[in-house]
Swiss-Prot record:
Main location: cytoplasm
Gene encoding the protein: impt-1
Binding partners and assembly: Interacts with gcn-1; prevents the interaction of gcn-1 with gcn-2 and inhibits gcn-2 kinase activity. Interaction with rpl-39; this interaction occurs in a gcn-1-independent manner. Associates with ribosomes; this interaction occurs in a gcn-1-independent manner. Associates with actin; this interaction occurs in a gcn-1-independent manner.
Lineage of source species: Eukaryota, Metazoa, Ecdysozoa, Nematoda, Chromadorea
Keyword Cytoplasm appears in the UniProt entry: yes
UniProt protein name: Protein IMPACT homolog
Keyword annotations of the record: Cytoplasm, Differentiation, Neurogenesis, Repressor, Stress response, Translation regulation
Domain RWD: 9-102
């Protein structure tokens, strides 16, 4: 069988075996949602499984760093043991076993739609972070945060402040995009980047929107607290709408004449 035929067969098999876990599927990407708010996005290269490994991204707001490292290393070990063969079934089984073995102290997340916070905790907010309205859809909650940034140090500082807030730190995803300008020898240098944090493809859409709006020297983070019900493409619409709204509310983008 060709790589493409093996991928198609594997995807069909996974959809029939794990229908409750498989949130999204295309011929190049699979998105799984597990208990304990653990998510796994898997991207399939064109030469998988014969040559390249699938690329995975994990999200787990309730996992400690060392727990994530154990899971990450275990997934890599499973691939090494199965080089050249379909491996995703083994990966999903491993994640399920990992979750079953988690201690009870890793609690099930509670719905936070009515408990999303705006004040900062622990870290002093010296970046004047602004917070948008909370949007809820089928028990998931979304909230945008915005700050002016003019360096990578500013970007890192904003993230530290946001994640010092317990609720924001425990969001299922904190999707981030930023743009800022510096000068070298009088020439403007544009800097930009984005981070999906497990919500694959969401941050690049945010950055594209910021580019279209010509929003410079600004960073937007959209927090999503997953409520247990799959939203499909609607979640991308919510993330983009909140990004646009908080930028407009804070006078970023083209100025109206």
């Amino acid at each position: 069988m060709s790589d493409e035929e093996q991928r198609i067969a594997e995807i069909e098999s996974l959809a029939s075996i794990f229908p409750d876990l498989l949130e999204e599927t295309t011929d190049k990407q699979l998105v799984f949602k597990f208990d304990r708010d653990i998510g796994m996005t898997i991207n399939l290269p064109e030469d998988y499984p014969s040559i390249s490994p699938p690329i995975f991204e994990l999200s787990g707001p309730y996992l400690r760093r060392e727990q994530k490292e154990v899971l990450h290393n275990s997934l890599n070990d499973v691939y090494i043991e199965n080089i050249g063969f379909p491996v995703i079934f083994n990966w999903i089984s491993l994640v399920q076993d990992f979750i079953r073995d988690l201690p009870e102290e890793v609690a099930e997340p509670s719905h936070v739609a009515d408990d999303v916070v705006t004040p900062m905790a622990e870290e002093i907010d010296d970046m004047n972070i602004r917070h948008g309205e909370v949007l809820t859809d089928r028990k998931s909650a979304f909230q945008a945060h915005l700050a002016e940034v003019r360096s990578k140090e500013d970007v890192d500082r904003v993230m530290r402040i946001l994640k010092s807030n317990t609720k924001i730190c425990r969001a299922t995803h904190n999707i981030t995009a930023y743009r800022y300008m510096t000068e070298i020898n009088g020439k403007p240098i544009h800097h930009h980047d984005c981070v999906d944090d497990g919500e694959f493809g969401a941050s690049s859409k945010m950055l594209e929107l910021m580019d279209r709006m010509k929003a410079d020297n600004v960073m937007v983070v959209v927090s999503r607290w997953y409520g247990g019900i799959h939203l499909g493409p609607d979640r991308f619409r919510h993330i983009n709408n909140l990004t646009r709204q908080i930028l407009s509310d804070n006078n970023y983008g083209p100025k109206k004449s």
